[in-house]
């Protein structure tokens, strides 16, 4: 049972997690789209080539969470699960459920503000019929 409200994200607003894997790869290769987010963690879209990093109970290297155009937030993330999500253009994508570890209260507050702001914008759009 979930302790936190979880918000599914579409392409907009943009939320990404940058994983510093330390191997000197192109930074874009380690920039992962957030599929959903809560105060307790994120689900990430992970390309097939990177899924080996996303094994259950593995704590990822230092990560930066970017919510819309705000400054990136440093977060510690531990993988809860990884499951095949979809295939797009002959490339398999995985859904990796991850929990925040020792999230500072100030960063948790910023995540929650993003959730509420995004939900308010969605509700306003729906009321306008869009």
Enumerate the language-model features and the residues they cover.
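Structured alpha-helical
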Residues: 1-130
């Amino acid at each position: 049972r979930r302790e936190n409200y979880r918000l599914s994200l579409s392409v907009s607003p943009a939320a990404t997690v940058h994983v510093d894997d330390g191997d000197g790869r192109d930074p874009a290769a380690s920039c992962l789209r957030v599929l959903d987010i809560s105060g307790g963690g994120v689900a990430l879209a992970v390309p097939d080539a990177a899924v080996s990093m996303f094994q259950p109970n593995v704590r990822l290297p230092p990560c930066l969470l970017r919510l819309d155009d705000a400054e990136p937030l440093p977060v510690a993330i531990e993988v809860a699960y990884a499951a095949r999500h979809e295939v797009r253009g002959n490339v398999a994508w995985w859904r990796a459920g991850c929990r925040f570890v020792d999230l500072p209260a100030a960063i948790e507050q910023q995540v929650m503000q993003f959730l509420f702001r995004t939900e308010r914008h969605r509700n306003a759009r729906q009321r306008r019929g869009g």
